[in-house]
């Protein structure tokens, strides 16, 4: 099983809040049959399952602390192993957030085939998030919080992008356009992996 993971197509998907990466991931799943794994979703699912690990996570998150890297990696690996036979590849969404996370992922799970960088300007992301905030009811979709989230994102992501850029596996997608325009660019990169 572990060997199969090492051979699997693994795509890190990186993009700021409001860049549209979630939407692009959904479209990739539909067209290519990849499995979309978001560390945030995995954590939330584990917490609501009421498992032993979930209870520990809940306590950590309630204090506003970061979940230990080992725990996140174990959850990712478990989720990937569960799907490795039925999936054409994996989209790892919102991970790695720092270089160390990427290195640990490679040691414990496998090498990324590609890093898809869904890149939209700060202005575009802000407008999209404000618009989403009107309907989503998400507390973190207001202008002040958005500014902070974008800052955090840029500071964390730049070193990750340059780390993988040195290996030549970063594919930058211009996410300013419509969903379909962006997706056709995404497809050119994924089609080249076959």
Curated annotation (Swiss-Prot):
One of its GO terms (molecular function) is deoxyadenylate kinase activity. It is an enzyme of class 2 (transferase). It catalyses: a ribonucleoside 5'-phosphate + ATP = a ribonucleoside 5'-diphosphate + ADP; AMP + ATP = 2 ADP; dAMP + ATP = dADP + ADP; dATP + AMP = dADP + ADP. Signal peptide: none annotated. Its EC number is 2.7.4.3, 2.7.4.4, 2.7.4.6. One of its GO terms (cellular component) is sperm flagellum. ATP binds at residues 18-23, 132, 177. InterPro entries: Adenylat/UMP-CMP_kin, Adenylat_kinase_CS, AK1, AK1/5, P-loop_NTPase. The modification N-acetylmethionine is found at residue 1. It is found in: Cytoplasm. One of its GO terms (biological process) is nucleoside triphosphate biosynthetic process. Residues 38-67 are annotated as: NMP. Belongs to the adenylate kinase family. AK1 subfamily. Monomer. Consists of three domains, a large central CORE domain and two small peripheral domains, NMPbind and LID, which undergo movements during catalysis. The LID domain closes over the site of phosphoryl transfer upon ATP binding. Assembling and dissambling the active center during each catalytic cycle provides an effective means to prevent ATP hydrolysis. This is Adenylate kinase isoenzyme 1. The gene is Ak1.
């Amino acid at each position: 099983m572990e060997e199969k993971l090492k051979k699997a197509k693994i795509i890190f998907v990186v993009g700021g809040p409001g860049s549209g990466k979630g939407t692009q991931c959904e479209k990739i799943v539909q067209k290519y049959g990849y499995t979309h794994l978001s560390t945030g979703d995995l954590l939330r699912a584990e917490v609501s399952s009421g498992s032993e690990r979930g209870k520990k996570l809940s306590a950590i998150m309630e204090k506003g602390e970061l979940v230990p890297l080992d725990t996140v990696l174990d959850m990712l690996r478990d989720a990937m192993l569960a799907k490795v036979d039925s999936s054409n590849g994996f989209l790892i969404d919102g991970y790695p957030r720092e270089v160390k996370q990427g290195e640990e992922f490679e040691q414990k799970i496998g090498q990324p085939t590609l890093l898809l960088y869904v890149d939209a300007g700060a202005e575009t992301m802000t407008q999209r998030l404000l618009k989403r905030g009107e309907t989503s009811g998400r507390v973190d979709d207001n202008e002040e919080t958005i500014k902070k989230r974008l800052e955090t994102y840029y500071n964390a992501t730049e070193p990750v992008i340059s780390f993988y850029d040195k290996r030549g596996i970063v594919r930058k997608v211009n996410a300013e356009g419509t969903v379909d325009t962006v997706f056709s660019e995404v497809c050119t990169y994924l089609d080249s992996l076959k």
